[in-house]
Amino acid sequence: MSAKDIKFGSEARNLMLDGVNMLANAVKVTLGPKGRNVVLDKSFGGPTITKDGVSVAQEITLEGKFENMGAQMVKEVASKTNDIAGDGTTTATVLAQALVIEGVKSVAAGMNPMDLKRGIDKATETAVNALREFSQPCNDTKAIAQVGTISANSDISVGDIIADAMEKVGQAGVITVEEGSGFENELDVVEGMQFDRGYLSPYFVNNQESMTANLETPFVLLHDGKISNIRDLLPTLEAVQKSGKALLIIAEDIDGEALATLVVNNMRGIVKVAAVKAPGFGDRRKAILEDIAVLTGGMVISEEVGLSLEKVTEEHLGTAKRIEIGKENTVIVDGAGKKVDIDGRIAQIKAQIETTTSDYDKEKLLERLAKLSGGVAVIKVGAATEVEMKEKKGRVDDALHATRAAVEEGVVPGGGVALVRVIKALDGLTGDNHDQNIGIDIAKRAMEAPLRQIVTNGGGEASVILNEVAKGKDNYGYNAATEKYGDMLKMGILDPTKVVRAALQHAASISGLMITTEAMITDTPQDTPATAAAPDMGGMGGMM
C-alpha cells in the first residue's frame, strides 16, 4: 500500500481553496450576456470554443492533488445542478466560490465551522422558500422563448425554435436535439404516435408516390402473439368488411397463410387492410401495445386476459383518424382513446420514470411518454463548421433544459436579480448563536456574487450597479446586454426558478462540506526510476 500525504486544518483548507479558485475563475468568465469564451484543447481534432460553464468545469483536472480535490468538489456542484435543472452551472460555481472564500476566512478568524455551516443551511432554506414565493408561472410562448434565448447566451433564434417546438408537441412532448446538415436551425415535427415498424408486405402500399399505406379512419386490431392461421382472423375481417372501413393489424408477427390471404384481400379490394409487427421486445412490446390500445380506444387481444382472436368483436378494436405506414415507420394520428384513460396511462408512466434506477429504462419510458403525449419534435442544429456545431448544439441543449425547468417551477427575474431580492427575506433571520449569524451573513454576501460577476464580465462597476439594483423592488434590475435598468421580465430577462434554486442548494451543500473539512489525505507522489539503458551487446560488432 502506497504512503499517504496528509494535511490538516487551515493548510488543508487553503490548498482546497486554491483549487476552488482555479476552477471557478475559469468557469465564471462565461457568465452573462457579455460572458467571454473559453477555448478547450482536445487530444484529437481542433479546439472547442464554449461559453457553457459545465463544459469548462469538466475539462479541468489540476496537477496538485490537494488543489484538485477542491476543484473536483466544485465540479460536482456544476454537474449536480446540470443534472437536475439542465442549466445554472456557472451560477452554482460562482455561488460556491463566494461561500467557500468567506467561510474559510471566518474559520481562520476563529469561528466554529459547524455553526457557520448551520447558518448557511438556515439562510439557504429561507432563501429557497422566498424564491418559490417570488416565482411566476411560465406558460405562454413568449415567456418560453425568452427563457430559451437567455439560456442560449442571448441567441434569439434558439429561443424561438424551442418555443415553436413546445407549442407543436405540448410541454410534456419529447423534443430532441440533433446535428443538422444545413447552416440554419430547423424544426421537424412528427404528429401522433410513431413507432419503428413498417408494413410486412409492399403489396399493402396504396400511395405509390410516397410508397406508404395510408388508412383513413381505420379499425386497429392489437394482438400480442403470432398470427399464422387465417381462420383466427375471419370474424374480424367479416365485421370490418360490413362496416366498409380499413383495418390495421399490429401483432408480434404475421406470416404464412394469414399474411398471403390479407395481401390478396387487400389487392382485390375486398377488405382494405395492412399489417405491421408490434414494436419492441418482451415486456416492453406488451407495454407499447397497451399504450396503442389506450391511444386508439381498443384492447390488446391476449390469452393472458382470456381473449382469443376468434372471439374478437368490433368493441375490441381501436380506431384512429388516420394511420400512415411506411417501409420502416408507422404513425397513428388522432387516436379515438378517451382523454381520461390516456391521462391515466401518462401518469402511470411518469410514476415509473420517478422510481426507475436504470438510465436505459428511463430513456425508453420517456419515449413512450412522448408518443402518448402527442408527438415528437426534432431540432436540427445548423452551423458552418464542426467546432461551431458542437458549441451551438451544447447551447441548444442547455436552452431546452432551461425552458423545461421554467415550465415546471416558473420563472424569476434574471441577471442575478432574484438572488439579490431574496436577501431581503433574510434580514430578520437569526441563528442560535453569533457564529450561526456569521454563516447567515456569508450566505447573504454570496447571493450578490452572480450579479457582480455578470456586471464585471460586461465591463461595468459591480458595486455601483449592485447598490442601484438593491434599492429597487420586485423585477427592477440591470440589463448587462444593453447596460440599462428596468423591469427584467418586461425586458425578457428571465431565469427558471428551478435553475436558481438548484444552483443555490448545491453550492450551499458543497461549501458546507468544504468549510467543515479538517484533514485531507492523498497518495504521496511516487518518483519513478529512470529506465536503465540496454546493456552493450559485445561480440556482435559485425552486424549491420
UniProtKB/Swiss-Prot annotation:
Xref: HAMAP family: CH60 (MF_00600)
Residues noted as binding ATP in the record, renumbered to the chain: 30-33, 51, 87-91, 415, 479-481, 495
Role summary: Together with its co-chaperonin GroES, plays an essential role in assisting protein folding. The GroEL-GroES system forms a nano-cage that allows encapsulation of the non-native substrate proteins and provides a physical environment optimized to promote and accelerate protein folding.
Compartmental location: Cytoplasm
Family annotation (SUPFAM superfamilies): GroEL apical domain-like, GroEL equatorial domain-like, GroEL-intermediate domain like
EC number: 5.6.1.7
PROSITE patterns documented for this protein: CHAPERONINS_CPN60 (PS00296)
InterPro entries registered for this protein in UniProt: Chaperonin_Cpn60_CS, Cpn60/GroEL, Cpn60/GroEL/TCP-1, GroEL-like_apical_dom_sf, GROEL-like_equatorial_sf, TCP-1-like_intermed_sf
Keywords: ATP-binding, Chaperone, Cytoplasm, Isomerase, Nucleotide-binding
Originating organism: Ruthia magnifica subsp. Calyptogena magnifica
GO molecular function, one term: isomerase activity
Cross-referenced NCBIfam families: GroEL, PRK00013.1, PRK12849.1, PRK12850.1, PRK12851.1
Family: Belongs to the chaperonin (HSP60) family.
Pfam families, alphabetized: Cpn60_TCP1
Major location category of this protein: cytoplasm
Assembly and binders: Forms a cylinder of 14 subunits composed of two heptameric rings stacked back-to-back. Interacts with the co-chaperonin GroES.
Protein name (database record): Chaperonin GroEL
EC top class named in words: isomerase
Sequence segments annotated as region (Disordered): 525-544
Listed GO biological process terms: protein refolding
Low complexity biased stretches: 525-537
A Gene Ontology cellular-component term: cytoplasm
Family annotation (Gene3D superfamilies): GroEL, GroEL-like equatorial domain, TCP-1-like chaperonin intermediate domain
